[in-house]
Swiss-Prot record:
Protein name: Transactivator/viroplasmin protein
Species of origin: Cauliflower mosaic virus (strain PV147) (CaMV)
Protein function: Enhances the ribosomal termination-reinitiation event leading to the translation of major open reading frames on the polycistronic viral RNAs.
Subcellular location: Host cytoplasm
Transmembrane segments: none
Phylogenetic lineage: Viruses, Riboviria, Pararnavirae, Artverviricota, Revtraviricetes
């Protein structure tokens, strides 16, 4: 019995050695060694095998128990046809030949190091030009008048210098040279002190000393009427004034020439309506919003066909833009329909001191059908500075005519009315009394001889002729005073040393009293 147990134990040991030899053979084949048949295999006794031999040395028959009888054959020994020990389950065995490590096959160039070039200069990738690096651009702002007049290089300081100060003029320039030239030209014409350059860190927008604080005018606090509600802890902050520089005569002449010379080539976002003396812009979808704003300030727009997101008019005055948004959401059922803005406007008027009159616009909003652009033609541009007043009178007469035509329309909805802007649209119902009063108030303020910022006899004569055709009457204080001066001069029979002095045709704006069927 004891001999059988020893033989079984020896059989297991031999099977382990056989499996170990087979594993070495498979490793040698994987290594691709060509000396497999020449070199004898040097066997090293592993730690596990030494433990088996030591167990056999101390083996005693009393420690061996009989193996229980198995019901299934072939379960008492290892099957020699099935590999019970795979190479991945064994620790690597060191032999005379270096084993291949799988990591070598994952290295670039099969593990062969590639020497790097010592030359720093390379002609394959030339150095990039430093001109491609974008540097932040600094704008300069000139505040011409007011308590904080000067030249600033930061818009935050400029906005703080202009907020809460009515009548302050300011403009943006790209370089300090342009800003200095504009500031010197203004101070020379006004005969005032030269404006100083105020950097961002040195802007003092508050009194510098206690004495200046005492001499500064006191701040007027708002009087709050409390009816059961708590009074606010502080005064309301002044409204921010958006940066909208006034249009200059040079800007207007540039846009005027652009409209006269535009022939429709190379730009499908706009077309022009050409008349004998002026060309007006018609902007379509995807037009440049900045150009739309400049043309609007110049009074050179006839129609705007904006996109659904109204990106073309995003730089127009906020109240005009809000009126258009309300029209889309409240006045039409299908908010995806295209709309139009039809504008009738005057043009600006300048004097030596600067801008005298801003354009006054009458804007009609409606649902647009298919846009059929007219053919833009390159027109001859021979306008001179002396001709601007005549052109302003012509546009003023057309604006008055379009305003008087509103009286013939019985179904009008007033979307927005301001001092110099009226926005309206067609309505399915009759005009309500509130909208009628708003239109009449706007007509009384605009339809006068002072439409262009100064008393213009040609405008007065045009209003008088137009109103008389409708059976009304129109009177102007300036024209009556002029007639009285002429009559008094003709009645005087005394000697005359020379021609009588003539009054200046440019006077400050004064609203005349009118009486007519359209204008009360």
């Amino acid at each position: 019995m004891e001999n059988i147990e020893k033989l079984i134990m020896q059989e297991k040991i031999l099977m382990l050695e056989l499996d170990l030899v087979r594993a070495k053979i498979s490793l040698a084949r994987a290594n691709g060694s060509s000396q497999q048949g020449d070199l004898p295999l040097h066997r090293e006794t592993p730690v596990k095998e030494e433990a088996v031999h030591s167990a056999l040395a101390t083996f005693t028959p009393t420690q061996v128990k009989a193996i229980p009888e198995q019901t299934a054959p072939g379960k008492e020994s290892t099957n020699p046809l099935m590999a019970s020990i795979l190479p991945k389950d064994m620790n690597p065995v060191q032999t005379g030949i270096r084993l291949a490590v799988p990591g070598d096959f994952l290295r670039p160039h099969q593990g062969i190091p590639i020497p790097q070039k010592t030359d720093l200069s390379s002609t394959v990738a030339p150095l990039r030009a430093e001109s491609g690096i974008q540097h932040p651009h600094i704008n300069y702002y000139v505040v011409y008048n007011g308590p904080h007049a000067g030249i600033y290089d930061d818009w935050g300081c400029t906005k703080a210098a202009t907020n809460g100060a009515p009548g302050v003029a300011h403009k943006k320039f790209a370089t300090i040279t342009e800003a200095r030239a504009a500031a010197d030209a203004y101070t020379t014409s006004q005969q005032t002190d030269r404006l100083n350059f105020i950097p961002k860190g040195e802007a003092q927008l508050k009194p510098k000393s206690f004495a200046k604080a005492l001499t500064s005018p006191p701040k007027q606090k708002a009087h709050w009427l409390t009816l059961g509600t708590k009074r606010p802890s502080g005064d309301p902050a002044p409204k921010e004034i958006s940066f909208a520089p006034e249009i200059t005569m040079d800007d207007f002449l540039y846009l005027y020439d652009l409209g006269r010379k535009f022939d429709g080539e190379g730009d499908d976002t706009m077309f022009t309506t050409d008349n004998e003396k002026i060309s007006l812009f018609n902007f379509r979808k995807n037009a440049d919003p900045q150009m739309v704003r400049e043309a609007y300030a110049a009074g050179l727009i006839k129609t705007i066909y904006p996109s659904n997101n109204l990106q073309e008019i995003k730089y127009l005055p906020k109240k005009v833009k809000d009126a258009v948004k309300r029209f889309r959401t409240n006045c039409i059922k299908n908010t995806e329909k295209d709309i139009f803005l039809k504008i009738r406007s005057t043009i600006p008027v300048w004097t030596i001191q600067g801008l005298l009159h801003k354009p006054r616009q009458v804007i009609e909003i409606g649902v647009s059908k298919k846009v059929v652009p007219t053919e833009s033609k390159a027109m001859e541009s021979k306008i001179q500075i002396e001709d601007l007043t005549e052109l302003a009178v012509k546009t003023g007469e057309q604006s008055i005519q379009s305003l008087l035509r509103l009286n013939d329309k019985k179904k009008i909805f007033v979307n927005m009315v301001e001092h110099d802007t009226l926005v309206y649209s067609k309505n399915i119902k009759d005009t309500v009394s509130e909208d009628q009063r708003a239109m009449e108030t706007f007509q009384q303020r605009v339809i006068s001889g002072n439409l262009l910022g100064f008393h213009c006899p040609a405008i007065c004569h045009f209003i008088e002729r137009t109103v008389e055709k409708e059976g009304g009457s129109y009177k102007c204080h300036h024209c009556d005073k002029g007639k009285a001066i002429v009559q008094n001069a003709s009645a005087d029979s005394g000697p005359k040393d020379g021609p009588p002095p003539t009054r200046s045709i440019v006077e400050k704006e004064d609203v005349p009293t009118t009486s007519s069927k359209q204008v009360d």
